[in-house]
A protein has these predicted regions:
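Conserved SAM-binding motif I beta-strand of class I
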Residues: 75-80
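Conserved SAM-binding loop
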Residues: 89-90
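Conserved class I S-adenosyl-L-methionine
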Residues: 51-58
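Conserved SAM-binding loop of SAM-dependent methyltransferases across substrates and taxa
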Residues: 61-74
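Class I SAM-dependent transferase core
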Residues: 7-49
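Conserved Class I SAM-dependent methyltransferase catalytic core
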Residues: 149-176
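Mobile active-site "lid"/loop adjacent to the S-adenosyl-L-methionine
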Residues: 125-154, 158
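A short acidic, Gly/Pro-enriched loop at the edge of an enzyme's catalytic core
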Residues: 111-121
Length: 176
């Protein structure tokens, strides 16, 4: 019998979800931040190419990068501001055996300097303006839904600077 290291197994406060008939597995908390339908929709929409170097802004649990793993690309740098979610994304990358293709970086998009350009930048960014509306008591959930640590304008500005010539960007963002 083979056992996985404890870090790649869900604990009592987590769930294990499977996609693509179990080819991609994702651990996420039962409460707090949980990815929505936007994540698989974004992953399906993104067209990758062999050799693509990609950057994900706000990876959360790593779900979009993980779902992209069934498509051709060289590597994804998955940027995440929140330490707990960055660690969860690392666990999910390890769980799926993707350390050679997905690197999770804990950092702030407003100060992140990758030192290279990317063929593709993608994100499922927060889209509720600042601290408007209902803020969840979960700081993790609020940061994922509200523009508390960067606006869409800042995300687009930074994306423009990170794209290689001919690069592409993909975002999930409401029409209004």
């Amino acid at each position: 019998m083979t056992t996985r290291p404890a870090a790649t197994r869900p604990d009592g406060g987590e769930t294990l979800d499977a996609f693509y008939h179990g080819r991609v597995r994702v651990i996420q908390g039962k409460t707090g931040y949980r990815f929505s339908v936007d994540a698989p929709l974004l992953a399906d929409f993104i067209r990758t190419r062999e050799g693509d170097e990609a950057l994900e802004i706000g990876t959360g649990s790593g779900i979009v990068a993980l779902l992209l793993s069934v498509k051709p690309f060289k590597g994804v740098t998955a940027l995440e501001l929140q330490p707990g979610l960055a660690e969860l994304a690392r666990r999910n990358v390890a769980l799926n055996g993707l350390r050679d293709r997905i690197e999770v970086v804990e950092g702030d998009l407003r100060t992140y300097e990758p030192g290279r350009a990317f063929d593709l930048v993608f994100s499922n960014p927060p889209y509720i303006k600042g601290a408007t509306g209902f803020l969840s008591p979960s700081a993790e959930k609020s940061a994922a839904k509200h523009e508390l640590h960067g606006t869409i304008g800042e995300i687009l500005e930074r994306t423009a600077g990170w794209l290689a010539p001919g690069g592409r960007a993909c975002f999930v963002y409401p029409e209004k």
